[in-house]
């Protein structure tokens, strides 16, 4: 009986220990993620984009991103033009 109780106690301590380590790991990820999001936002803000009408309102293909073309019929939005590559 004593060895079973000791084994259960050791397993309980190990469970609590690993749970605490996981929580600490998750906490560090959560602390780091706002900084990562802010740095990514700066990258996207600093990048100039040629395409301005991705979600609608285009009148010509040049307003769309590469490999997208403006639809000729309503609803006017940028759609894939069937090409690949850079």
Swiss-Prot record:
Cellular compartment(s): Secreted
Transmembrane segments: none
Propeptide: 21-49
Disulphide-bridged cysteine pairs: 51-65, 58-70, 64-78
Cellular component GO terms held in the UniProt record: extracellular region
Sample GO molecular function, one term: potassium channel regulator activity
Signal peptide (from-to): 1-20
Domain statement: The presence of a 'disulfide through disulfide knot' structurally defines this protein as a knottin.
Family membership: Belongs to the neurotoxin 10 (Hwtx-1) family. 47 subfamily.
Protein name: U18-theraphotoxin-Cg1a
Species this chain originates from: Chilobrachys guangxiensis (Chinese earth tiger tarantula)
